[in-house]
Regions:
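N-terminal glycine-rich anion-binding loop in soluble enzyme alpha/beta folds
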Residues: 1-47, 116, 120-123
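Short, acidic/small-residue loops that bind anionic groups at enzyme active sites
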Residues: 15-18, 78-98
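Metal-dependent catalytic neighborhoods of phosphoester/phosphodiester hydrolases
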Residues: 36-37, 75-81
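Hydrophobic alpha-helical segments within soluble ligand-binding/sensing domains
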Residues: 45-54, 87-105
Length: 123
């Protein structure tokens, strides 16, 4: 889980090496989500991921992250199903690209992400 290690490293760089952040992970079955996407059952995908976000809310998390690009295909629909603030990987990527003055970016991902324009539009 590279993202977990990266979060810990960055946190300790900022806060101190003798500290660790409290992190709650709600892992979903991506294969189930992919089957729902293949069947174009987008409302069920939003409900499935939204329910996971609500589990994080019940765990008293301050915000949520979806560590894959593909769920962001339905970011607004998922956010509408939970009161937990979700951070958008798309908005974060746009902000980082602008800050670094990047003009051409590459994206490697699932067929669902690659066949959609949700990641291209903001750029």
């Amino acid at each position: 889980m590279n993202y977990y290690s990266a979060i810990i490293k960055r946190y300790q760089e900022r806060i101190g090496t003798d500290k660790l952040p409290r992190i709650t992970i709600e892992s979903i079955n991506m294969y189930h989500m992919f089957r729902l996407l293949d069947a174009q059952q987008y409302d069920k995908v939003a409900g499935y991921v939204g329910a996971a976000a609500n589990n994080l809310l019940k765990a008293r998390c301050d915000f949520g992250l979806m560590c894959g690009n593909t769920p962001h295909l339905l970011f607004d629909q998922i956010q509408a199903r939970t009161d937990l603030p979700l951070l958008s990987i798309v908005e974060t990527a746009v902000a980082a690209a602008q800050q670094l003055h990047l003009q051409r970016l590459a994206l490697l991902d699932t067929k669902f992400t690659m066949q959609s324009d949700f990641f291209i539009k903001p750029f």
